[in-house]
């Protein structure tokens, strides 16, 4: 079950500030011209042992004041449909506005948890002013200061009440979600795979397809493919369609075993792509990167290798993710994409024995032991895979607190080199022995 927390409210109430506070990330994931914090509308958060995705609706509202108002109301409706819990933000220093009343009217009619967040309660006087928001009929307001973090702990305690427990479930049939930015070719790939016009590929709002799971068989292997390429009925504003599609995609990401993340070869890897990869990694999903529209790229003998090298450099720590070049339009390598995704699933669910880990990793550690810290030598005695669905490798040693990040990266690289872990998130833990 996906946990989606949507922040709604009129402009300038502090939605983005609260978003940054909850996901605890203040800088862009990729420092390039195409990827800045402007591209980041959703992020991973965890509290009280529960994981959830926070969506900042402010990132989807653009244009004139009339578009603002229409979009805000529309997004409130979408959030009601798709989110686990809605955070409705208001401004203590401004008080109740006509726009607040309009959004509150929509939210009151919803059969969905709504938490009224009274922001900018930076001192006792403004916190007392939060009581006026009782008039909105949405229960007790939560006075907070998103800027300083005051009150956000109590708010998060209540948010997690409405979130499902984070339990990794091992499934018999792999579930694969096709994700990516608008117009990268998700629908074209799905239609090419299925041989039918299952997803709507026109930009016309007024047609609808809900995200659905369907079981398929390829080369004798069953898998579930999640179709996230849907357009919401009656949506008239472009940003609303994007917001709706994003919520659906985020739910699909959380429910999937493997995420196929598609990018456009003519645009390359952009900030939103890296953010999506990072989110999938944090949720411990298998990942495959598809470079679509490869037919539009002028090529020579080195194009493929150079393009792949550039992407791997941009991915940094995620450079182990398999990359496949396809053309959904011309059906080039589309079935290889599913084969590769199933391969990632096999990598993710493989059972690595303790004996194999120790036979492989202890000689590696002996050749290059952990550097001493403060004159103290770290001795790793044995290695074991913990009984989790996604690989968690435990290193038992005398001084686990002194193992430094560069050495952890070295160990992860050696694990990936010696075991089939391409596209798989691997967690390393160090325990006292």
Swiss-Prot record:
GTP 1 binds at residues 9-16, 56-60, 119-122. Residues 3-167, 174-349 form the EngA-type G domain. Pfam families: KH_dom-like, MMR_HSR1. It comes from the Bacteria. GO terms for biological process: ribosome biogenesis. Keywords: GTP-binding, Nucleotide-binding, Repeat, Ribosome biogenesis. GTP 2 binds at residues 180-187, 227-231, 292-295. The keyword GTP-binding applies. Residues 350-433 form the KH-like domain. The keyword Nucleotide-binding applies. One of its GO terms (molecular function) is ribosome binding. GTPase that plays an essential role in the late steps of ribosome biogenesis. Associates with the 50S ribosomal subunit. Belongs to the TRAFAC class TrmE-Era-EngA-EngB-Septin-like GTPase superfamily. EngA (Der) GTPase family. This is GTPase Der. It comes from Amoebophilus asiaticus (strain 5a2). The lineage of its organism: Bacteria, Pseudomonadati, Bacteroidota, Cytophagia, Cytophagales.
